Amino acid sequence: MAYAYLFKYIIIGDTGVGKSCLLLQFTDKRFQPVHDLTIGVEFGARMITIDGKQIKLQIWDTAGQESFRSITRSYYRGAAGALLVYDITRRDTFNHLTTWLEDARQHSNSNMVIMLIGNKSDLESRREVKKEEGEAFAREHGLIFMETSAKTASNVEEAFINTAKEIYEKIQEGVFDINNEANGIKIGPQHAATNATHAGNQGGQQAGGGCC
């Protein structure tokens, strides 16, 4: 299917926070309770619609282990959006956010949109990190924030789509150079065709005007 833009995402965070489950829920609308540890990087894609335009999300799901951190870093460079995930039932995953964020900002383009996600909101009885703490961290670092549940699908759709909306707004504002694919944005065939049609119509109008 033709698309106007392609946005590249990267999902980052500690091992076991539910990164692969979030991706699977978003792309396949299913939950897999037992998931093998991601080795290196996995990949998923899905089409969404923003402002009447088809946008393809290309999502890279990274390994959380320290031993794969160098591989993860190489994927930051071409990403327009990042989902930084922690587990609300494990405080250590929240405590490590600063390290992940520093790493992301050091190795990515400065305009990358980052969504902070507190995952496993369905496990309220085991919560170790208050929602207010997530909100405060996001505010302090200029991130978008949501709590999600990959199991129940709560806010999963919204997390991916709201990140895309933010990227799309930055394109409209001229913040992103869409001709530089290093920014994690690619102009699709649909967008190019629309522009060509628009240019053709303008040319036709001008030619018609000249004949009068």
UniProtKB/Swiss-Prot annotation:
One of its GO terms (biological process) is autophagosome-lysosome fusion. Gene3D superfamilies: P-loop containing nucleotide triphosphate hydrolases. A lipid is attached at residues 211-212 (S-geranylgeranyl cysteine). One of its GO terms (molecular function) is GDP binding. Residues 2-19 are annotated as: Required for interaction with PRKCI. It comes from the Eukaryota. InterPro entries: P-loop_NTPase, Rab_GTPases_membrane_traffic, Small_GTP-bd, Small_GTPase. PROSITE patterns: RAB (PS51419). Keywords: Acetylation, Cytoplasmic vesicle, Endoplasmic reticulum, ER-Golgi transport, Golgi apparatus, GTP-binding, Hydrolase, Lipoprotein, Magnesium, Membrane, Metal-binding, Nucleotide-binding, Prenylation, Protein transport, Transport. Pfam families: Ras. GO terms for cellular component: acrosomal vesicle; autophagosome membrane; cytosol; endoplasmic reticulum membrane; endoplasmic reticulum-Golgi intermediate compartment membrane; extracellular exosome; Golgi apparatus; Golgi membrane. Regulated by guanine nucleotide exchange factors (GEFs) which promote the exchange of bound GDP for free GTP, GTPase activating proteins (GAPs) which increase the GTP hydrolysis activity, and GDP dissociation inhibitors (GDIs) which inhibit the dissociation of the nucleotide from the GTPase. The keyword Cytoplasm does not apply. SUPFAM superfamilies: P-loop containing nucleoside triphosphate hydrolases (SSF52540). Interacts with PRKCI. Interacts with TRIP11. Interacts (in GTP-bound form) with GARIN1B. Interacts (GTP-bound) with HOPS complex component VPS39; interaction contributes to obtaining a functional HOPS complex that promotes autophagosome-lysosome membrane fusion driven by STX17-SNAP29-VAMP8. In contrast with mouse ortholog, not able to interact with VPS41. Belongs to the small GTPase superfamily. Rab family. This is Ras-related protein Rab-2A. It comes from Homo sapiens (Human). The lineage of its organism: Eukaryota, Metazoa, Chordata, Craniata, Vertebrata.
